[in-house]
Every structure is written in structure tokens, then in C-alpha cells.
């Protein structure tokens, strides 16, 4: 039996095949009509690594029953011959909201912030919606399904994009013929998470990314506790978390830093998240290699910027311009890094761009095999459907696309998409082409006829001499009909012909006057021009990334060197004081020798004649380099940590280096009495967030007093405390609860195994764990403070609970209570000369630092500001001006003293043998307003060099100019463009709510 070559395709309905056998029928005799389909002749790509040149696929009941080079044709089979075609598995989309309605946010404004959950019988936070199941609201969308099929998709995993814990998704095929019972492969396919709050509730917490991270962690702890019977009440959200824990977990992120953050949480709790990424992961591959995430990669490659206007072009950062150039390499770079990934279309404005952008990724180096895997087998594995979808094998769903060429070639088109054995025509079979220019003659009159697009929807143009005549055309079933007007547009002629020879058209019709007419049209030979040949598009040269991938980044990260500073004035901050014409030798990141040095074993020499060498500046109070600063959704946020949200790409880190800063503490803001945990970092420009963290540093936490925590200047008054008296009660209450929490765990841990088997473990509370660390002297307090009464209050509360406040920061009335601070053992990290910028600092004076210093308090000057942090050397000089502090002691205000407050003075803060080589070379006296930083060294490596910085200014200008020229060329070549938009940067301060 020969295969049948179908010219006209038809739809095969499987309703009789798949209808449940226990359903009654009242429309006739109940029969089983099991049709089989045999596809032959095509190149069949069984999976990304295996193909058959003349493959055959046998389909029955929506599934593949055989794939081979030779199959005996069943008697009742319908045979399709696709000779010359290519067949691939249909694609799988894992991150969609197909058919699931979105929730619109409330349009009514709230005067007061909502602090508590609305849902009863669920988790204490409304943004944990683990109990929601997307299949309950699913409604199949034929229009959207058609769009997705046209781009190659056969299966989508769909969920409602709402909340931090979003509940479950459903896995559904794009089969228009059947009902949801047949389409739905899994009603609970995966659970979904994000860092975004839901529109279903106005509950404020979490108000920051670090709050969202803490909440996710606490949910996991609570689910474990709940599963062990710890709760007295029923919590349907936690029950859903427990029920769904075996499902794949898909985590949506908004930027590259969030990808790593999500991966860290997953690794912490043994969850192998599938993380929906953002397209610029190539910028942090070293981090991702360590975390080993599974990724869903978008392909929304940016359009070139329209840089015709040079003033608008100035708004663009180098990173924005590089992203246009480098983004198409993202899939290749991720593949080369050995990271498992699948593609997603979810970030595209138009799904039609999906396959062209995949092809672009292949052009930029991604292998076709890896690209196909990311569309088929890998998403199938990730969603626990290996062998069922994503490949053409026995037992798998008959989901396949048929193309007219190799999938990743630019001109190849998807002609059909079969879903569960159901044929969907994407591109109808083309009609015989009659495109071309013809010389049309009738009644001794000549016309020019041009036909185009005849394979699909024909377009016709007729001109007489130079006059265009209004023309319409139809080309159906081999018959061509032309209708056109005369030059006056008042009379019409109508011609028709049956196409036999496309080079010579002959027919009859009616002339303008209504008389019968014969006509003919001979095709005009076109002269082929040499320059009309298609030229292969030359890809833009991809620029190398830097670390970080923006202005002033490094091509390779700095490493420690063997360096000898000679003939330099050395500010030791030790008993030796200031050494003239001295040397400092640095080896392996440490200071090896100070003073007169003879043998340096091949060190690189830096002549410091006329210059000054100091230890690096330490900023005890900073808010730079973080993605969020305040978690103000509760009156205590001890559960959050700045370490979660460090932003290593913040340009302020580089600017700090240019000001000689080598260590800084990024503090939580002052939105609540008990704030979050801080991060102590070294600004190693180009390193990852984890690599910047100060190793083995003591942990700190931010407390706050005054106007901010009682919301004096807020428009909402719904949160306790609202008075300074209430602030005192917050500290007392939380410390007491921490004591009781500690006692409960001690009692449980000290119990015998026999007793433990009969009782329930206490609930693990991240917030309480942090406060217990304070009670145990393992975590230290840095407290935002202004007014002496509150300063006294906190010291008294701390004494009552056996706690010592480590640092009062700001402390602008410290001069009033310096003696009490000395007795308590607390340091003061203050401003040099800030006063009268709000009511509670009306009594501030510029002599504050000097007075506290004279009373024996360890005093530091901090910045609390991204601008001031670059000139803390000048702030130190103000201690000499206001109060007559010696130059050496004043310099310690920004070096050794903050090191003492941070408990790292054994490693940094002075120039001493054995300490870390965190050094700054100044052009002049370090406290002079004329002095500039020439070099900044951290752990023996130069992270800032003035000469290099000056050279980079020119390099950046040249690179931006090249990218502008490339974008102009792309625009002239017809590429889409976008309007230049300046990338907004947020400057965080104590009161910034994010």
C-alpha cells in the first residue's frame, strides 16, 4: 500500500476515541472507532540528539505508538506523506498564565497601612497563597492557544502570577478540539513562588525584597513545625505547602541578583528551584556556577536604542548599551557554564518573536542541539514529564511540529503543529505561484500587470502607461479573477482564467463597456542584478564583559600582589605614630613589614615620595550597595538581613574606593525599633556579594529610636509604637519574649529522647533566634539615636536584660550623656557637623565627637550617605577644627575607631605587621581638601587606581561611541528601536522604605 499524499488537509476529531467509556450515549450506537495515523517521509528529530532521515511515526488515541524507519502500515491508518519536511517535538512553556485570570489591584486608596492578614484559617501573611490551585479558575483560551501553537508550543504550564507563594499550576495541552479533561495533563503540576506581593491583599509586610526572603524561609520552618503537630489551629496555607512539597518549584525573579537570591534560599532548604531568569545572567556566571540553579531563560532581547538625538543618547549607561550588544549570547554562555536551562516566552510582548529570537541565540553561538533541548526535553524533565512530552518516542503524546526546513534556519516556517495527535494548520499549503510582472493585452491595449504573494493572499497592481488603475484580485482553486477600473475610476473590467501555464495567462471576461473580451498576459523576463543577491547578515561583534559589567569594571579581577611602598609618610595608627620616609611591604594580602626594609624578594616598588599611606577608611554606617534598606512592615524586623540584598554592581562602591573606603557596614534603616541584621563588607569592585562579605566578622543588628520608629512624619498611624514610651515597651517585650523562647528550646533540647517523643518541639522563629543571639552576646547592637532621654532608656533596658549596646549611631546628643556611655561601654558613631535638619536634632553641636572622645568613648565619624562616604577623610579633619582633637586621633575616627566598634581592629584599622593590607595612597596629607586618593588596596589587591580611572573615562567614551554607531547602523538596516531611557538609581537613607 502506497502512502497517500494529501493535498487538502482535514481535521480529525478524536472525541469518539477518548470519550470516557463509562459515559452513556443517546445519539446512536456506541462504537469504538480507533483510527490510526501514519506520518511518513520527513526527517524526524526524535530528540535533540537522535533523528531519522526518512522517519515514520504511528499515532493512535493522541499518543505515539511507534517511531521507526520502517513501519508496517495498519489497514485502517490514515497516511500523511511529508517528504521534504522536518518534524520536531512541539515546544513546552513552563512559565505562563495561559487561561488563568489575573487579579487586579484595588483602585481604592488606603489612608492607613494594613499590617495584619485578612484571610482567616490561613497563614498569618496574606501573600502566602500556597492553597490556591490555578486549575480551579482555568478557562481555555483558543485565541491565545493559536498564537502559542504558531510559535511551536504544544504544552504550557500555567499559573496565576500572584503573591510570594502562589500555589500550584496546571499542565495543559493546546488542543482546540477536546475538553479540559482531555487537555489537562496535570491539575497540580508545580508550585510557584516569587518575591512579589499579591494584589489580593493590602497587607504591607513584606515591604522589601529582604522581607520577602525572610518570609519564605519562615514558611518552610513553619511548615515543618506544623507537619510535626506543633500548631493548635488549622492552617490551610501551610497544609498546602506540605501537600505540594514533592512538586517542582518554579521561582519567578525580576533581576539577575534575585536569581542568585532565590537559588540560595532553595539550596538552604534543599529545594531545587526552577528559576525564571531575566536575560543577563551572563554577567554573574561565576556565582551561578557555584549555586547550580535550574533556569528558565527569556529571549526578550532588547531592541537597539534610537540614538539619533545625541542628547537623548547621553541618558544611556554603558551597561544599558552593552546589554543590547551582549544579550543574545546569554543562552550560549549559560550552556557553556554547564547550567541546565529551558527557554520561556513569558517576557515577550509578542510570542511571534520567540522562535526568531531562539534562532538569534543559535547565531550567537548556542548549539542547535542545546537549543532544541531547551525547548523540549529539558522542560519535560523539569516538570516531571520525561518520556511523556518533549520527544517523539513510543508512549509519548503525539505533540509535534512540521517545518519546511531545519528548525533554526531563518527562512524555515512552522507549517503544522500536532497536539495529542490533533492536526493544527499553521501555514496553509501554498498555491501555485504566479508572482511576477506580466504584459497584459486586450482589445489592442497594453497594460502592466504585477502579481505578488500569490501563494497565499494574492496582491495585484495594473497600470496603463504611468496611471495606476484600481485593482482587486482573487486566486482560488487555480482560478485567477482580476477586476480593475479605467483611468476615470468610473468603469470596470473583469477578467478570469484557469492557471495552466504561469508564464502565459489566457482568458476572457468583460471590458469596460461590458462587451466580451479575450485577453492574454505574458510574463516579462526580469534582469537579475548582481547587487540584488542576498547577502549574509554579519553579526555585530560582541563586546567582552567586565566585572562588574558597567563603566570602570575590570576585564579580570584584581589579585593580591607583592608590593613595596617606599619613601612614603605612613600613618600607622599604632604606637609608632606617623613615620616619615618609611616603607610598607605587602605580601599575600597581608602587611609583612613596616619601617626600614632592605630585602623585599622581588616586590613591585611604588615610590611614595611626597605622598601619604594610611590604613583604609572604615564607614560604620552606610546604606549603599543594597537592593533594599528598610523592612517597615512590622515593629520588629530582626528576621531580615542586609546580607541577602547586597548589590555588588552599585557604582557607589567604586566611588567609595576613590575616597579611600575599604570596609563599610551596610545597616538596616530606622523604620522600626528593632531593625534587620547588617552586612559588613569590603568593597571589592567586580566581586560577587558573597565575596565582598567580611569573613568571620561579628554579626550586628540595627535598633532605632526617635521620630522614625514612632512614625512621626508618616501619613499612617496604624502601627505600634506611636510614642517614645511605646518604643521602650517594644524593646522590653521583645527581649522578654526572646528569653522565654530561649528557655523553651533549652527545656526541649535538654529533655531525654523518651520525653521528646511525647512532646512537640517549639516553633523555630528566625526573629526570636536573632534576638536570642543578642541576649547571648553573640550579636551586637548599632542603634540609631538622637535624644538623650531615649539613649538613657535603651541603656537601662539593655542593663536589665544583661545586654550591652555596642554602638549608638548618629548620637547627636551624645555629648550630654558621654559619661553614662563610657560606663555602659558603648561607642558613638556620629556625624561631624550635622545639626538642625529635623526637630529631634535641634540640640546637636559640631563639638559632639570631640566631647565624647574626651570622656573616653570610642568615637567614629560615619557617612549615612553615598556622597559623604567619598570624603570621610575631610569629615575626620573637622574633629581637629571643632574641639581640637589631634590629627592622629582625628584620623582614627574614620579608621581604627570604627574598626573597634565593628570588632575587626585585630585585622584592619591600622598599619601593622600581620594585619590585612587594606591601604590607601594619598597625593598629600590625608585630611587635606586638596588631597586625592591615588591607589586603594584591599587584601593586597588594587581595586582603585587613579591613572587607570582616568584612562577608563576615555575608554568608556570610545566604547559608547562604537555602540552608538552600531545602533545607528542597525536602525538604518531596518531593525526595531526603542527610545532611550535613563536607568533610575535609588539612593537609600535611614528612612527609605524599601
Sequence positions of predicted segments:
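Polyanionic/metal-chelating signatures
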Residues: 140-280, 413, 419, 434, ...
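Tryptophan-anchored aromatic micro-motifs
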Residues: 39-42, 429-450, 455-465, 471-473, ...
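Histidine-rich, glycine-flanked metal-binding segment
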Residues: 21-35, 44, 48-90, 105, ...
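His/Asp/Glu-enriched, well-ordered alpha-helical/loop segment
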Residues: 28, 41, 103, 111-123, ...
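Beta-sheet ligand-binding and adhesion/scaffold domains
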Residues: 95, 441-443, 447-448, 479-549
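C-terminal cap of metal-dependent C-N hydrolases
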Residues: 42, 397-430, 568, 916-956
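Bacterial Sec-dependent N-terminal signal peptides
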Residues: 1-22
Amino acid at each position: 500500500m502506497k502512502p497517500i499524499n494529501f493535498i487538502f488537509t482535514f481535521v480529525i476529531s478524536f472525541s469518539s476515541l477518548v470519550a470516557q467509556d463509562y459515559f452513556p450515549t443517546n445519539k446512536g450506537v456506541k462504537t469504538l472507532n480507533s483510527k490510526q495515523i501514519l506520518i511518513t517521509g520527513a526527517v524526524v528529530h526524535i530528540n535533540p540528539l537522535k533523528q531519522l532521515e526518512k522517519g515514520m511515526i504511528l499515532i493512535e488515541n493522541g499518543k505515539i505508538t511507534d517511531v521507526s524507519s520502517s513501519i508496517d502500515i495498519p489497514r485502517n491508518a490514515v497516511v500523511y506523506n511529508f517528504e521534504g519536511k522536518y518534524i520536531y517535538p512541539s515546544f513546552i512553556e513552563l512559565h505562563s498564565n495561559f487561561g488563568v485570570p489575573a487579579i487586579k489591584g484595588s483602585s481604592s486608596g488606603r489612608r492607613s497601612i494594613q499590617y495584619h492578614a485578612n484571610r482567616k484559617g490561613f497563614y498569618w501573611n496574606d501573600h502566602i497563597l500556597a492553597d490556591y490551585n490555578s486549575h480551579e479558575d482555568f478557562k481555555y483560551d483558543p485565541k491565545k492557544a493559536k498564537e502559542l501553537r504558531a510559535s511551536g508550543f504544544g504544552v504550557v504550564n500555567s499559573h496565576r502570577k500572584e503573591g510570594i507563594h502562589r500555589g500550584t499550576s496546571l499542565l495543559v495541552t493546546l488542543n482546540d478540539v477536546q475538553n479540559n479533561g482531555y487537555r489537562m495533563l496535570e491539575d497540580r503540576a508545580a508550585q510557584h513562588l516569587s518575591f512579589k506581593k499579591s494584589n489580593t491583599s493590602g497587607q504591607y509586610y513584606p515591604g522589601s525584597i529582604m522581607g520577602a526572603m525572610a518570609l519564605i524561609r519562615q514558611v518552610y520552618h513553619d511548615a515543618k513545625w506544623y507537619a510535626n503537630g506543633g500548631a493548635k489551629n488549622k492552617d490551610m496555607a501551610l497544609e498546602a505547602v506540605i501537600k505540594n512539597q514533592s512538586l517542582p518549584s518554579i521561582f519567578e525573579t525580576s533581576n539577575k541578583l534575585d536569581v542568585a537570591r532565590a537559588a540560595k534560599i532553595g539550596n538552604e532548604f534543599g529545594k531545587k528551584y526552577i528559576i525564571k531568569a531575566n536575560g543577563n545572567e551572563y554577567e554573574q556566571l561565576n556565582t551561578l556556577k557555584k549555586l547550580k540553579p535550574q533556569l528558565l531563560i527569556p529571549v526578550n532581547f532588547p531592541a537597539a536604542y534610537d540614538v539619533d538625538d545625541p542628547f537623548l543618547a547621553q541618558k544611556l549607561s554603558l551597561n544599558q548599551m552593552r546589554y543590547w550588544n551582549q544579550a543574545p549570547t546569554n543562552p550560549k554562555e549559560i550552556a557553556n557554564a554547564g547550567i541546565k536551562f529551558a527557554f520561556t516566552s513569558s517576557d515577550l510582548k509578542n510570542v511571534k518573536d520567540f522562535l526568531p529570537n531562539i534562532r538569534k541565540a543559535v547565531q550567537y553561538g548556542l548549539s542547535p542541539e542545546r537549543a532544541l533541548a531547551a525547548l523540549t526535553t529539558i522542560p519535560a524533565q523539569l516538570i516531571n514529564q520525561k518520556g511523556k512530552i518533549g520527544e517523539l518516542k513510543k508512549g509519548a503524546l503525539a505533540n509535534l511540529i512540521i517545518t519546511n526546513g531545519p528548525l533554526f534556519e531563518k527562512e524555515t516556517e512552522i507549517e503544522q503543529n500536532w497536539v495529542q495527535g490533533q492536526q493544527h494548520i499553521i501555514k496553509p499549503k501554498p498555491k501555485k505561484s504566479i508572482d511576477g510582472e506580466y504584459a497584459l493585452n486586450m482589445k489592442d491595449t497594453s497594460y502592466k500587470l504585477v502579481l505578488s504573494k500569490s501563494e497565499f493572499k494574492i496582491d495585484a497592481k495594473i497600470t496603463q502607461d504611468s496611471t495606476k488603475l484600481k485593482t482587486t484580485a482573487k486566486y482560488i482553486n487555480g482560478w485567477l479573477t482580476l477586476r480593475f477600473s479605467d483611468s476615470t475610476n468610473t468603469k470596470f473590467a473583469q477578467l478570469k482564467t484557469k492557471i495552466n501555464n504561469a508564464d502565459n495567462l489566457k482568458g476572457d471576461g468583460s471590458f469596460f463597456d461590458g462587451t466580451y473580451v479575450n485577453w492574454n498576459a505574458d510574463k516579462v523576463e526580469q534582469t537579475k542584478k548582481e547587487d540584488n543577491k542576498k547577502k549574509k547578515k554579519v553579526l555585530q561583534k560582541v563586546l567582552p564583559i567586565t566585572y562588574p559589567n558597567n563603566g570602570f569594571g575590570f576585564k579580570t579581577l584584581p589579585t593580591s600582589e607583592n608590593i613595596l611602598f617606599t619613601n612614603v609618610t605612613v600613618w600607622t595608627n599604632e604606637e609608632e605614630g606617623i613615620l616619615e620616609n618609611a616603607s610598607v611591604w605587602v605580601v599575600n594580602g597581608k602587611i609583612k613589614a613596616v619601617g626600614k626594609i632592605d630585602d623585599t624578594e622581588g616586590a613591585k616598588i611604588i615610590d611614595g615620595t611626597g605622598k601619604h599611606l594610611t590604613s583604609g577608611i572604615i564607614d560604620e554606617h552606610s546604606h549603599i550597595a543594597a537592593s533594599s534598606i528598610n523592612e517597615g512592615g512590622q515593629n520588629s524586623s530582626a528576621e531580615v538581613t542586609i546580607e541577602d540584598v547586597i548589590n555588588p554592581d552599585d557604582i557607589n562602591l567604586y566611588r567609595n574606593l576613590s575616597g579611600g573606603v575599604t570596609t563599610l557596614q551596610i545597616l538596616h534603616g530606622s523604620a522600626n525599633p528593632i531593625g534587620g541584621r547588617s552586612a559588613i563588607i569590603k568593597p571589592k569592585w567586580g566581586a560577587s556579594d558573597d565575596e565582598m562579605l567580611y569573613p568571620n566578622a561579628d554579626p550586628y543588628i540595627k535598633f532605632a529610636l526617635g521620630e522614625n520608629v514612632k512614625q512621626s512624619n508618616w501619613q499612617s498611624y496604624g502601627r505600634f509604637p506611636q510614642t517614645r514610651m511605646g518604643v521602650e515597651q517594644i524593646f522590653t517585650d521583645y527581649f522578654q519574649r526572646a528569653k522565654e523562647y530561649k528557655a523553651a528550646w533549652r527545656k526541649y533540647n535538654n529533655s531525654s529522647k523518651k520525653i521528646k517523643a511525647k512532646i512537640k518541639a517549639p516553633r523555630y522563629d528566625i526573629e526570636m533566634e536573632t534576638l536570642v543571639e543578642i541576649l547571648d552576646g553573640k550579636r551586637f547592637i548599632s542603634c540609631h539615636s538622637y535624644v538623650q532621654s531615649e539613649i538613657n532608656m535603651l541603656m537601662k533596658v539593655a542593663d536589665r536584660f544583661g545586654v550591652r549596646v555596642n554602638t549608638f549611631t548618629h548620637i547627636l546628643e551624645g555629648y550630654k550623656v558621654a559619661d553614662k556611655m563610657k560606663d555602659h561601654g558603648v561607642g558613638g558613631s556620629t556625624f561631624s557637623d550635622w545639626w538642625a535638619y529635623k526637630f529631634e536634632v535641634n540640640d546637636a553641636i559640631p563639638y559632639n565627637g570631640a566631647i565624647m572622645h574626651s570622656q573616653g568613648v570610642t568615637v567614629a565619624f560615619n557617612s549615612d550617605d553615598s556622597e559623604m562616604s567619598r570624603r570621610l577623610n575631610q569629615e575626620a579633619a573637622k574633629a581637629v577644627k571643632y574641639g581640637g582633637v589631634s590629627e592622629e586621633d582625628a584620623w582614627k575616627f574614620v579608621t581604627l575607631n570604627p574598626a573597634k566598634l565593628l570588632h575587626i581592629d585585630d585585622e584592619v584599622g591600622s598599619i601593622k605587621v600581620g594585619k590585612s593590607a587594606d591601604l590607601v595612597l594619598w597625593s598629600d596629607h590625608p585630611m587635606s581638601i586638596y588631597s586625592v586618593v591615588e591607589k586603594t588596596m584591599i587584601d593586597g589587591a588594587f581595586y582603585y587606581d587613579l591613572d587607570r580611572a582616568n584612562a577608563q573615562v576615555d575608554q568608556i567614551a570610545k566604547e559608547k561611541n562604537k555602540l552608538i554607531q552600531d545602533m545607528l547602523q542597525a536602525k538604518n538596516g531596518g531593525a526595531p528601536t526603542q527610545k532611550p531611557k535613563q536607568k533610575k538609581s535609588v539612593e537609600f537613607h535611614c528612612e527609605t522604605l524599601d
